[in-house]
Amino acid sequence: MAKKYINDVRFWLLAIIIFGGGFALHPSVGLSILDFPSLRVGLYQIVAVSLLLFSLPLLLKKRQELLKNRWLIGGFLAIFIAITVGIFFAEARLRTALYSLSLLFLLAVGLSAGLIYSELSKSKKRKLINVGLWSGLVFGILAIIQLTVATFEPTGLGTLCAGCKADVFGFPRINLFAAEPQFFANSLLPAFFLALFQSKSRLAKFSLFFTTIAISLTFSRGGFLSIFIAITALFIIAFVKRIDASFIRKKLPIIFAGLLFGFALLFSSDRKSVV
């Protein structure tokens, strides 16, 4: 009974993590300590900590298997060395240390999520995939709504800071509940690639279209670069290993349509603000 309860809690925590990446900033409260205004604790961070704590038994159970994974250990070791060197040479060591701890925490949550996912049944894995697809669809629609509202009426919802309006940047900056557009675009990448690999799902096609629109509305170079590099790498791997990548080529028109539609919305918003 207790094991089933723990497994259910793990599943729902992972579902929230997958769906709620766009809520990385709000709702949250700022911690006015260490002269670090960006230090905040929010609902999403609490869920992430809970996921990490509930995964500890799995980490202990599979510790031998994890320690034998050279790529995993080598990757963590390289990151740890880079962080140590970075802190040593940084001018603001405390701030660099806090950012570094955030990165390590993110990696630990990713490892925990992977372990929990590997323990799920096929039906629950399918449910999580659908959660990710719905995340892309919902946040894509919300991004369009934010753009529309910010175009016709300046609003504080989801803006970067007080006074960060469309008339300052020239067009609305779409970030919804994330700290900035770049972070919002990054939070949509899991939904984007989930939709890309679901070849026979109508939900996946809608999710891919609206996720692409949302990423284009952020005007995030990092988001565009991540998608371009990942798709290029997939085609190279498929060519070298002679893997059928036709399902990716079939999704490219959806991606291009989403980008064009998103840029058209941004252009229309810019013209509206000028008028």
Predicted regions and their residues:
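A membrane-periplasm/extracellular boundary helix in multi-pass inner-membrane enzymes
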Residues: I141, L147-A150, F235-V275
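Membrane-interface helix-boundary motifs at transmembrane edges
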Residues: L59-R70, Y117-L128, Q198-L203, V240-R249
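Membrane-embedded alpha-helical segments of multi-pass membrane proteins
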Residues: S38-P57, S100-G110, F183-F192, L225-T232
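Membrane-interfacial loop-to-transmembrane alpha-helix junctions, especially the N-terminal start
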Residues: I6-I17, Q64-A78, K125-G132, L203-A204
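Juxtamembrane membrane-water interface segments that cap and precede transmembrane helices
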Residues: A24-S38, A162-F177
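Alpha-helical transmembrane segments of multi-pass inner-membrane proteins
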Residues: I81-I87, R126-T159, A166-G170, N175-K241
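Aromatic-anchored transmembrane helix interface
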Residues: L72-I79, R93-L115, V131, G136
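N-terminal signal-anchor transmembrane segment
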Residues: M1-L60, V85-F89
